[in-house]
């Protein structure tokens, strides 16, 4: 039995859950998410909690059991609170701006890099150097933030580039030179 999978998922008051076979739909104040779970996983709603259990004792069911519980818990938290990732742009002349639903990054390339925001994701910029990605789908928020970071990952000598807020870049020493 999975230690994570055994835990019941509490349902906040403003969130409603619909279970139709293997499809779980979660509605809340921020929006609606749905996901189809694998056939070897059973989902039940009891009182104000959701319980995820394996339908069979196969190896595959045990592998996916904790994952499915976490995915449903992330959906519940997403529609009630939402998710946010912050990125910091560091470097001389490096900056970001939002034009409509598109993020425009000037990070040292000959042309600005334009990144359209996926459906359900909001991108905001503070002070031209702080990018905020938020939405209700944890997976989509994380993937969007990772794509923005991948445009110009932090380099190890000066630390220039796009990094997550709170991420520590271990800087290397440059060449020693002749004495």
Curated annotation (Swiss-Prot):
Molecular function terms, GO-annotated: rRNA binding; structural constituent of ribosome
Statement: the UniProt record of this protein carries the keyword Ribosomal protein: yes
Superkingdom of this protein's organism: Bacteria
Keyword terms, alphabetized: Ribonucleoprotein, Ribosomal protein, RNA-binding, rRNA-binding
Biological process terms in GO annotation: cytoplasmic translation
Any single GO CC term annotated in Swiss-Prot or TrEMBL for this entry: cytosolic large ribosomal subunit
Keyword Lipid biosynthesis in record: no
Entry-linked InterPro entries: Ribosomal_uL6-like, Ribosomal_uL6-like_a/b-dom_sf, Ribosomal_uL6_a/b-dom, Ribosomal_uL6_bac-type, Ribosomal_uL6_CS
HAMAP family reported for this sequence: Ribosomal_uL6_B
Protein family per UniProt: Belongs to the universal ribosomal protein uL6 family.
Function, as annotated: This protein binds to the 23S rRNA, and is important in its secondary structure. It is located near the subunit interface in the base of the L7/L12 stalk, and near the tRNA binding site of the peptidyltransferase center.
Subunit structure: Part of the 50S ribosomal subunit.
Protein name per Swiss-Prot or TrEMBL: Large ribosomal subunit protein uL6
Gene giving rise to this polypeptide: rplF
């Amino acid at each position: 039995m999975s230690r994570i999978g055994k835990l019941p998922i509490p349902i906040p008051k403003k969130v409603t859950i619909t279970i139709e076979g293997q499809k779980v739909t979660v509605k809340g104040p921020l929006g609606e998410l749905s996901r189809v779970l694998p056939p070897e996983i059973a989902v039940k709603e009891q009182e104000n909690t959701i319980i995820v259990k394996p339908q069979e004792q196969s190896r595959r069911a045990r592998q996916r059991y904790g994952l499915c519980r976490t995915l449903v818990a992330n959906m519940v938290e997403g529609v009630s609170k939402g998710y946010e990732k912050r990125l910091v742009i560091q470097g001389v002349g490096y900056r970001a701006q939002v034009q409509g639903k598109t993020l425009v990054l000037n990070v040292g390339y000959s042309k600005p890099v334009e990144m359209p925001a996926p459906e359900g994701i909001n991108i905001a910029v503070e002070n031209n150097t702080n990018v905020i990605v938020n939405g209700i789908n944890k997976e989509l928020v994380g993937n969007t933030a990772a794509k923005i970071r991948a445009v110009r990952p932090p380099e190890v000598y000066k630390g220039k580039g796009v990094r997550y807020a709170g991420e520590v870049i271990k800087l290397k020493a440059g060449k020693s030179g002749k004495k």
